[in-house]
Amino acid sequence: MKVINVHQRIIHQPKSAVVELFNTLASKNDLMLATHKWPAMKLDNGLTVGSKGGHGPIRYTVEAYSSGEFVQFRFSKPRGFHGFHRFDIVALDTHTTEIRHILDMHTSGFALLTWPLAIRWLHDALIDDAFDKTENHFLSQKKTTRWSAWVKFLRWLS
C-alpha cells in the first residue's frame, strides 16, 4: 500500500529561530520532539548521514541532511515499512517559517494492517505534539492538539 502522510505548521518566527530548535533534534535537550509524551529520538551519531537509531519500535538511518534545511531518514524497522520520513524547515518570508514532516513509503506484510489501524494514528499524534512543542517555544499562550479517542485507547493498550 502506498502511504504519503504530510504535516505542516506555520511558525511566525524567522527561519533562524526555528533552526535553533531543529538543530537539537535527537539530542539530550531535544526542543522539537515532545519527549515528555513520546519515546525520544535517539541517533548513534546525531544528525549526520549514516547515523542509525529511531524512536520506540521505529528504526531508521539518516539518509540525507542539510543543516538548517532538512533531515531525511530511511526506515529499517518495522518490517514492511519501505520508504522514508523527513523534516523540512522552509522560510516563507523573513518572519514566517513552515515546518513540515513528510512520510513517503510502501507498506507490505503485517504493516498493511499495523499502519492504518495503529501506527498511523500514533504517528499523527506524535507529529502534532512535536509541532505544538516547537510552536509553543515562541508563544505565551500554549497550544495543545487533543488526541483522538483512538490514540488514547492505543496508548492505554501499550
Task: Pin down the residues of each PLM region.
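Hydrophobic ligand-binding cavity/cleft-lining segments
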Residues: M1-L43, R155-S158
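Short, surface-exposed coil-to-beta transition loops
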Residues: I4-V6, H55-Y60, F81-R86
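A short, structured loop/turn motif at beta-sheet edges
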Residues: H12-S16, E63-G68, D88-E98
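Hydrophobic pocket/interface hotspot
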Residues: V18-K28, V62, V71-F73, I99-H101, ...
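Short beta-strand segments that buttress and anchor functional surface loops
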Residues: G46-G54, Q72-P78
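A contiguous binding-surface segment within folded domains or other stable secondary-structure elements
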Residues: T61-E63, G68-S76, G80, R86
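Beta-strand/loop substructures that line and gate deep hydrophobic ligand-binding cavities in soluble
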Residues: K77-N136, S140, T145-A149
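A short, hydrophobic/aromatic-rich structural module that often spans a beta strand
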Residues: R146-S158
